[in-house]
Amino acid sequence: MSAKSNKIGVVQLTILTMVNMMGSGIIMLPTKLAEIGTISIVSWLVTAVGSTALAYAFAQCGMFSKKSGGMGGYAEYSFGKAGNFMANYTYGVSLVIANTAIAISAVGYGSELFGTILSPLSIALWTIFTLWLATVLNFGGARITGNISSFTIWGVIIPVVGISIIGWKWFDGSMYVNSWNPHNVPTFEAIGVSISMTLWAFLGLESACANADAVENPEKNVPIAVLGGTLGAAVIYIVSTNVIAGIVPNLELANSTAPFGLAFAHMFDETVGKVIMGLMVMSCFGSLLGWQFTIAQVFKSSAEEGYFPAFFKKITSKDAPVVGMITITALQTLLSLMTISPSLNKQFNVLVDLAVVTNVIPYLLSMAALAVLLKAENVAPQKYKTTVFVAFIGSLYSIYALYAAGEQAMLYGSIVTFIGWTLYGFVSYKFDLKK
C-alpha cells in the first residue's frame, strides 16, 4: 500500500514530462523563425506530429527493452553491437554540439543584458569560457549541479508560459499577418528551413519514459503522459513563438540575440526586458551545467560497454568523470572556434542544424529496430501494429528533418557518421570475433 502511495498519477507524469522537455532550446527560436516569417507555424505543426510520434515510440522502447544503454540498446535489437555503438556515438556527438549551441544562447542573452556588442571572435571566446566554467563547476559531482538545474529551468518556463498567457494583450494581428512570408520564399522551402529549429526545441524527447518506474500502471499511463506532455510542450512552444511575432516587428525580432527579453521590453519596459534576459541567462547556464555532466555520463557509460576509450570511465572520489569532462570540453572549444560566423545567430544556426542531424541518426536506428524489439519481447499483436505504425511516422519525420537541415549540415553529419564507422572498426573485435 505504501509503495503504491509513493507512485505518481498520469496527470502528474504528464506535467513532469512536459517540464522536462521544455529547456533552453526555445530561447533563441523566435529570432530564427522570424527570418522565415510566421509561416513557420506550419513547421511547428509538422514537428508537433513528428515529435509526438517519436516520443510515443520511445516510451514503448523504454517500457519493453531488456537491453541497457538507452537508444544504443534499442538499436542493438536489429543492428547488433555496431548499431549500439553508432547510436551512442552519434548521440554523444550531438550532445557535444548541442551544448555548444546552448552556451552561445547564454552569451547572446548576456550580451543583450549588459548592452555589449561582441565581435565573432569575442562570441567564440565567451562561449568557450562559459563551457569551461560549467565543466569546472561539475567537478564536485552530480548532486549540486542537479539541484541547480532543476531550479534554474524555471527561468525559461515562467517567461515562456507567461508570454503564452498574457502576451495576447499586446498582440497585433496585422503585424503577424504582414510577417507571414516576408522574403516570398516558396512555401515548401520555407516550411523545411524551419524544421531543424522546431525539432531542436524537442531534443530530449527520447528520455520521455525516464520516470516509468515512478508511475502507477506504467504500461497504460506512460504512453498517455508522453503524448500529453509532448503535445502540451508543443502548444506552449507554438503559442509563445507566434505571440512574439505579433508583438515585435519582424525585422527587429530577426536581428535580436535575446528575443524573449525584447518581447517583454515591448510589452512593459526595458527594466522588465532586462529581468527576463537575466532569467534566461541563469536558466541557460543551469541547463548547460546539467547537460555537461550528462554528456560525460553518456561517454562514461559507452566506455564501460567497451565502445569508447577507457579514460572516459575514470571517476574521482565524488563520482565525477573529470577526465572525460575535460576531453569533451576541449572538443567543444575546438568546435566553437571552427564555427566562428559573422554573427551570433549564424553560428547558433550552424550548430543547431548539425546537432539535429547527428541526433536524428540514433532516432532512425531506434525506430527501425522497434519492430524486432517488440517481437522479441512478445508484445500483444494490436499494440505491436499500433506502435510500429507510429514509429514509421516518426521515421518519415526524421528523414524529412535530415533533408530540411540543408546540404552543409548533412555533409558534416555524414562525415561524423563515417568517422563513427571507422572508430567502430577499432573496437569491433571485442564484440564481433567468434569466441
Curated annotation (Swiss-Prot):
Keywords: Amino-acid transport, Antiport, Cell inner membrane, Cell membrane, Membrane, Symport, Transmembrane, Transmembrane helix, Transport
Topology of the protein relative to the lipid bilayer: Multi-pass membrane protein
GO molecular function terms listed in the Swiss-Prot or TrEMBL record: putrescine:ornithine antiporter activity; symporter activity
Presence of the UniProt keyword Transferase in the record: no
InterPro entries linked to this entry: AA/rel_permease1 (IPR002293), Amino_acid_antiprt (IPR004754), APC_superfamily (IPR050367), Symport/antiport_PotE (IPR027566)
UniProt xrefs under NCBIfam families: 2A0302, antiport_PotE, PRK10655.1
Function: Catalyzes both the uptake and excretion of putrescine. The uptake of putrescine is dependent on the membrane potential and the excretion involves putrescine-ornithine antiporter activity.
The protein's name: Putrescine transporter PotE
